[in-house]
């Protein structure tokens, strides 16, 4: 895997050039995430050296972030970079943005998000 060094004030990160996008997880017949297949997909990506994982609030009818939070629990948090996006269509105030950010932290079962888009 090739990596790009991302420099910022106070340090740098080596982020894989190829990321894992979580908008198209495998689905079961009822349209929900096939968690067994999706977890296997995540494991293959991480084992291949992918360390940038991207999701968003609305992916899979809102279930991508909660699933990803559960699935990533078995990996050390410092072994991957997590990206998600602010659902701007739900934001009418700074308070809305803050509330949604806290909600996304909870959904992802993490204390921080590396890249918030």
Residue map of PLM features:
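Short gly/ser-rich anion-binding loops that grip negatively charged ligand groups
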Residues: 54-58, 87-94
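Ser/Thr-centric signal marking residues that sit
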Residues: 55, 84, 110
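A short, structured active-site edge motif that brings together acidic residues
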Residues: 78-90, 115-117
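Generic beta-strand or strand-like secondary-structure segments
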Residues: 67-70, 85, 96-103
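Proline-rich low-complexity regions
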Residues: 16, 74, 87-88, 107
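Glycine/proline-rich, positively charged
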Residues: 29, 91-117
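N-terminal binding-site loop/beta-alpha segment at the start of enzyme catalytic domains
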Residues: 1-80
